[in-house]
């Protein structure tokens, strides 16, 4: 390549027209404005070969600056009769800042397993560009065109996302264990609907878990979901000042007041939520909106800052004031951004106030702008290599995480090493370039798609339908002709021993894990219907509401009580007994004790219900095991809670807790079995001796002394069945014992525990 060509290649691209909208809704001027609008994922189109050398670009542009400074996101919009070349200047250094932010995200994900602050920069830039787009429309007296903005934005963003999700579904079926399939199907649909962050909260995902190989390959869509939700809500704020703009009044000050108020409220909530429930706050859109507000406030204030500091753009042919200070400020911003993840304990502090650090760093680069110095950070960020990464940044964000997760799962590592990490990064760059060329760029530039609103809407709907259809079709294929698991059907191999040879089939299958949570067939009705509802409690019953029951058993407490429901069903069915599930996941029954906010009021709700239905007995778990080696205990207040039941004449079936683990027992054993290993090998890799998981003696033994002539406490200790011969194995016979790191599979409870429980309940009746 000749030297001049190399110099031009390094110098960096200027944007060309990336798409064209038809004349609909608001007319040609708004059509051009929408075309020129930029967001955090915009490209310079250099990937498609339409880059123009700097000299040619600057000769073709109008040198006239905006009265408030020609900065992307804040400068004046062209009039209907103005040449497209006079549009607001493309901020090449901000395009390069995208490359830095995305590079940080990828590097930290692949090698460090830490939060870098790069995602926060994308949220910040999204708001910066979005605000500039709508403020220019307001100040030029043009309609906001919010519906068209939504169509234009999601028409560009969703097709590459859909392609990535479809590739992930295919890779999941090929490379990942069946235990991950159902979750990934759910996340695929949630990601395409921009609801992934909410689903991750429901699934109680820990973003900062050290083992990325155990994470979902779609987990990273949480940030795109937050961004998508903001793209829907944020434009509506500008409608609040639309009438003022039509009257010719200034809109920036009212907008600053509105957005500052929202930002302050969001930041306050973010700080509180991060301190109390950081694993939820990390995915919470409300806890992230202040980052969007920060970008908007900078966009609104930048014209004044530009005017006061004498900012210029390269296209003006004039040097800015304070050139050295601008160059140093830009470098300080990049340095602060690079250092963020290294110097801060972001794993426990984000997204609280500490996220101001990466936003301030990005803001420094924005404010510094064009420095006029060859060594300025803007010059480096404006080079062609930086622009190339910026151009593929959206696709690179989409594909790098799935490639990393699939590789780590295949290799059995928690983090990639230097060499395999480089392979992951290189593969991500190549696939991102391909997705950009084959999907992203054609969709962005398609005049046909932009010509009519229904076409853009069709592209959005089709993208979502492909994902939902693929995930739903896969789910239906797996569950075709699959009956509900039978109650207490005998296993093909004895479940009181660990098989030394690989059984032909170990069940339940991974994609059936969602069916392993015990349920009852009827919603509570008739005399068993609660007088009022309670959050997170779904009252269920065995017999229909109009049935006549000989006795009633109510299951209360946490999911560790709920998991034993299948064990009592054979006895209940034979006796025509009513079984009611009033459990609440995460909340053991401890009436009379102070509870954490999530469980507050649950015990009172249970007692209110019991007073209404007057059951014969209550089944609840009374001890608590731990996954860190801490000895099993009888929680404080358990005896008092049981006494409240006995005083009401209600018998108690007090169940001993099951072992809890530091790793997912199903996935651990599944990995061994999938490689052709035996249950004995799975036990060696995943199991433990019972003395390492439970106390030597049942801590609940003293509770039997609470029994009265009218109501007794019956201890139910199923440890011999769960951990036969003193060993807690993940596979007994041809059945997986655990569905995760602390819950038994429904199939194991039915096959192995139900007979023992039946014998115990029959002895109670005798």
Predicted regions and their residues:
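Membrane-interface helix/loop caps of multi-pass membrane proteins
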Residues: 3, 23, 52, 74-453, ...
């Amino acid at each position: 390549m000749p030297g001049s060509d190399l110099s031009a290649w390094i110098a960096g691209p200027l944007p060309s027209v990336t798409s064209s909208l038809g004349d609909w809704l608001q007319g040609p001027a708004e059509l051009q404005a929408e075309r020129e609008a930029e967001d955090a994922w915009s490209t310079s189109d250099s990937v498609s070969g339409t880059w123009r050398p700097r000299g040619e670009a600057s000769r073709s542009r109008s040198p006239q600056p905006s009265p408030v400074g020609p900065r992307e996101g804040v400068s004046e919009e062209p009039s209907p009769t103005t040449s497209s070349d006079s549009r607001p200047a493309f901020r090449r250094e901000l395009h390069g800042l995208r490359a830095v932010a995305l590079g940080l995200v990828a590097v930290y994900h692949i090698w460090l397993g830490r939060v870098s602050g790069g995602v926060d920069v994308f949220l910040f830039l999204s708001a910066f560009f979005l605000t500039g787009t709508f403020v220019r429309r307001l100040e030029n007296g043009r309609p906001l065109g919010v519906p068209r903005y939504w169509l234009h934005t999601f028409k560009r963003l969703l097709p590459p996302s859909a392609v990535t999700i479809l590739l992930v579904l295919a890779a999941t079926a090929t490379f990942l264990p069946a235990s991950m399939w159902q979750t990934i199907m759910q996340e695929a649909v949630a990601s395409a609907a921009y609801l992934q962050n909410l689903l991750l909260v429901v699934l109680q995902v820990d973003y900062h878990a050290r083992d990325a190989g155990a994470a979902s390959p779609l987990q990273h869509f949480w940030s795109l979901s937050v961004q998508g939700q903001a793209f829907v809500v944020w434009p509506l704020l500008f409608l609040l000042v639309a009438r003022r703009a039509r009257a010719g009044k200034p809109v920036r000050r009212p907008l600053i007041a509105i957005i500052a108020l929202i930002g302050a409220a969001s930041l306050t909530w973010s700080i509180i939520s991060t301190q109390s429930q950081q694993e939820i706050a990390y995915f919470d859109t409300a806890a992230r909106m202040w980052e969007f507000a920060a970008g908007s406030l900078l966009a609104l204030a930048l014209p004044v800052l530009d005017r006061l500091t004498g900012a210029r753009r390269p296209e003006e042919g004039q040097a800015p004031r304070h050139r050295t200070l601008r160059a140093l400020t830009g470098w300080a911003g990049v340095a602060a951004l690079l250092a963020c993840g290294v110097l801060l304990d972001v794993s426990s502090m984000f997204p609280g106030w500490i996220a101001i650090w990466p936003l301030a760093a990005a803001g420094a680069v924005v404010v510094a702008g064009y420095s006029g110095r060859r060594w300025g950070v803007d010059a480096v960020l404006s080079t062609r290599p930086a622009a190339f990464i910026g151009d593929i940044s959206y696709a690179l964000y989409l594909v790098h995480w799935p490639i990393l997760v699939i590789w780590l799962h295949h290799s059995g590592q928690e983090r990639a090493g230097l060499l395999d990490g480089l392979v992951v990064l290189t593969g991500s760059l190549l696939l991102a370039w391909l997705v950009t060329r084959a999907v992203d760029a054609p969709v962005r530039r398609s005049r046909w798609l932009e010509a009519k609103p229904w076409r853009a809407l069709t592209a959005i709907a089709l993208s979502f339908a492909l994902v939902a259809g693929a995930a739903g079709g896969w789910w239906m294929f797996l569950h075709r002709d699959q009956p509900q698991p039978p109650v207490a059907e005998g296993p093909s191999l004895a479940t009181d021993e660990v098989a030394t040879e690989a059984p032909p089939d170990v069940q339940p299958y991974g994609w059936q894990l969602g069916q392993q949570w015990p349920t009852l067939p009827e919603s509570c009705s008739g005399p068993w219907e609660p007088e009022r509802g309670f959050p997170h409690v779904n009252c269920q019953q065995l017999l229909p509401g109009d049935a006549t029951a000989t006795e009633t058993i109510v299951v209360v407490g946490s999911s560790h009580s709920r998991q034993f429901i299948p064990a009592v069903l054979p006895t209940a069915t034979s006796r025509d007994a009513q079984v009611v599930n009033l459990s609440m996941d995460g909340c053991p029954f401890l009436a009379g004790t102070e509870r954490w906010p999530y469980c507050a009021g649950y015990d009172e709700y249970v007692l209110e219900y019991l007073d209404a239905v007057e059951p014969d007995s209550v089944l609840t778990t009374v001890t608590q095991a731990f996954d860190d080696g801490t000895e099993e205990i009888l929680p404080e207040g358990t005896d008092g809670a049981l006494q409240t039941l006995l005083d009401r004449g209600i018998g108690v079936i007090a169940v001993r807790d099951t072992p809890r683990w530091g790793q997912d027992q199903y996935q651990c054993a599944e990995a061994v079995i999938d490689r052709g290993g035996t249950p004995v090998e799975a036990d060696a890799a995943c199991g433990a001796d019972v003395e390492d998981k439970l106390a030597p003696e049942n801590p609940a033994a003293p509770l039997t002394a609470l029994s009265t002539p009218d109501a007794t406490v019956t201890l139910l200790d199923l440890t011999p069945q769960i951990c036969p011969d003193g060993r807690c194995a993940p596979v007994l016979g041809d059945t997986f014992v655990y569905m995760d790191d602390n819950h038994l599979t429904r199939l194991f409870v039915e096959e192995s525990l139900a007979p023992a429980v039946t014998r115990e309940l029959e002895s109670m009746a005798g």
